[in-house]
Amino acid sequence: MSTKTRLEPQPPDLQPPWRTAARVELQLEARAFAQDIVLPIADELDPKKGEMPRSLIDQMAAKGWFGITIPAQHGGMGLGVFEYCLVSEELARAWLSVRSILARGQGLGTQTINDDRRLGLLRRSAQGKWIGAIALSEPTAGSDLAAVQTRATREDGYWLLSGTKRWAGFALAADFIEVLARTREPKDGESSSAGLETFLVVKQPGIFPEGMTARN
């Protein structure tokens, strides 16, 4: 006889002044999605470290959840961090990896590019079509990011990245990777983080760009 896993316990109910009809509706929608859609997939894939299916990401995108905090005029829901946390908490109860994927939308990877391109990418982000990975840690640099050894050098009008990263979850399936690299050593009197910059590496899902290799 098969049994159906239940999510227990439930988070406490929202209380005034944070409780609104719209927030309760959003929370209950995410709770039902976590129970009925996410949990069965997690029960099957998580024990064997299986990859999240694209179909699940697409279902989340159809609900608009990758754009919870993106303004409505750019294709998002135009809500705030509170609403994002409500959805994130409910999804995490079923599968923590789903919460991680949710955070990779919300306009990630659009902050430092020109305005014209940013507007288009915000819309893609809200649609779940601009989902990123973040490459910070290295074999010798974990919590101390000032110890990062990856280098970025300017050559012929381009930036050349050279180094090794680790623990960059979702990197293969991502649409882009944000890579932390050092462009120069700190000068006397500067913070140890001086010279660290983030670079946006655009890629095709399932493929690493030329010159980049990976292993599990």
Language-model segments: residues:
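Short, solvent-exposed helix-helix connector turns and helix-capping sites enriched
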Residues: 49, 95-96, 116-118, 179
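FAD-binding core of flavoproteins
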Residues: 18, 100, 119-216
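Short secondary-structure transition/capping segments
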Residues: 80-83, 111-112, 146
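Residues within well-formed alpha-helices
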Residues: 29, 33, 108, 151, ...
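Amphipathic, small/basic residue-rich leader segments at the start of a protein or domain
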Residues: 1-103, 124
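Helix-loop "lid/cap" segments that line or gate small-molecule binding pockets
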Residues: 106-115
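Short, flexible loop segments at the rims of nucleotide/cofactor-binding pockets, characterized by
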Residues: 44-47, 113, 138
